[in-house]
Amino acid sequence: GGYMFKVDRLDAGEVGIRPLAGQSFGNVGISGPGANVLAWVNPREVSLDPWKRVTPAQSTWLAGHIGEAWMTLSSPTFNDPVSGYAKYWDVAAMIDHHILNTATKNADAFRLSSYWHKPRYGKLTAGPIWDFDRAEGSTDGRDFDWGTWTTGGGTDFFTYPWYSEMFRD
């Protein structure tokens, strides 16, 4: 099937999509208990309907696939058009996702509030975009000053894993 997941806090009762032994997703998301863990969106991890609940096999497969994709980003041949990151990632969607979140100064982007999906037979795809309540001059403060694009504090838009590695290409 197809899958949707997110970089965000886990809901009650969830354990998330965790990297397999020897793999990493990079330092995605927040620090603390939810760090380096992705949360399921569809199918759900916790659902009363067993047909809408993710299976252990699905979770293991997606974790392994994301781990392989991450490993290509740190390989010496990461930018090889056949065996590098483009084999796993929808690059155009990554670029669009990054531009939309960065141009709107979305303080939650990349570390929280980031949806991703993996269409059946498709590549890992950024989006759909969401959660702009802390963007474009909101009361957050970090989204008002353009000088905070690379100051840390959750607004270092060009160093988040997955994206930062692709920016080397």
Where are these regions (language model features)?
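Phosphate/dinucleotide-binding and metal-coordinating scaffold of catalytic cores
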Residues: 1-169
